[in-house]
Design a protein with these regions (language model features):
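Contiguous beta-strand/loop segments that form the cofactor/metal-binding neighborhood of enzyme cores
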Residues: 155-248
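Short, Asp-centered acidic motifs that coordinate Mg2+ and/or phosphate
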Residues: 18, 34, 115
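N-terminal Rossmann-like dinucleotide-binding module
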Residues: 1-14
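Alpha-helical elements of Rossmann-like donor-binding domains used by nucleotide-donor carbohydrate transfer enzymes
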Residues: 8, 25, 34, 46, ...
Length: 266
């Protein structure tokens, strides 16, 4: 526990009611209904399960477990406590322009879908001298590397639209295999930096189309870039967080199409 960081909160916010060094103390307090928990992935299985089993609502950070075994433990707690609200979400789909794209999906404006592309990309790890941190360590982050951290952002809308993968082909890259340890030495960096997944999925009409997911920590020029693109025979549309007010679309007619852009406000 970082006592200096904790003291900053207690010194600057008189609304802080409890300050504890053992999270079990929070679980035993009857006046606490919900807990927001952000911890390294290797702690998710036990701590998340303890929160749910204590009857508290949980707002958790992805990926809900360092591996399948830890995730199964959390899901078991959820099943045993259906009264507990357990949530994790990506904020990006709630831009008004992206909400417009989602409405188009729900309204069936795209017709027969050709393909969907969704991704979340960073560029901060392009610096090979950036010191290693826990998200680059398999024993703390997990073997899935960037997919566990960035995956929910790319998968949020497609999964909510019912486009779950029927199969998965993955191209995974570990581009920088060692980093400074912050103490003058160098250590192995074994997690996946970039992942591209190509999946078949099925639309509600039974037609099958490909979905491509990009999850990248090393993507030149991408500063927290999130995007969603849907291509169909009757219409296509795109959203990119680099242009958060822009809803880009085209209606398909004949052999030629033109991309249009409109501002979507709140």
């Amino acid at each position: 526990m970082n006592e200096a960081a904790t003291k900053w909160f207690t010194d600057n916010f008189d609304t802080v009611k409890y300050c504890v060094t053992d999270y079990h103390e929070l679980l035993n307090k009857e006046d606490i209904d919900a807990i927001y928990c952000a911890l390294p992935h290797n702690l998710h299985g036990k701590v998340y399960s303890d929160i749910i089993n204590a009857g508290k609502h949980l707002l958790g950070e992805k990926p809900f477990g360092i591996d399948a075994e830890a995730n199964a433990e959390i899901l078991k707690a959820c099943k045993n406590h259906p009264e507990a609200i357990v949530r994790c979400a990506s904020e990006f789909p709630y831009y008004p322009a992206c909400q417009e794209l989602i409405r188009w999906i729900k309204d069936g404006k795209f017709g027969k879908i050709i393909e969907v592309r969704s991704g979340f990309k960073h560029c901060s790890d392009m610096d090979p001298e950036k010191p290693i941190n826990w998200k680059r360590m398999i024993e703390i982050n997990g073997e899935y590397g960037c997919m566990g951290d960035l995956g929910i952002h790319a998968e949020h809308v497609p999964f909510r639209m019912g486009w779950t993968p029927k199969n998965v082909y993955a191209k995974l890259s570990n581009l920088i295999t060692e980093r400074p340890d912050g103490k003058g030495g160098r250590v192995p960096c074994l997690t996946w930096d970039n992942a591209t997944l190509v999946c078949d999925t099925e639309d509600k009409d039974g037609s099958v189309f490909p979905v491509t997911y990009e999850m990248k920590r090393i993507s030149p020029g991408s500063t927290n870039e999130w995007y969603l693109e849907v291509y169909g025979l009757e219409a296509s549309a795109k959203f990119n967080s680099n242009d958060p007010n822009g809803f880009v679309y085209t209606d398909s007619w004949g052999k030629e199409q033109a991309w249009c852009r409109i501002n979507v406000g709140y």
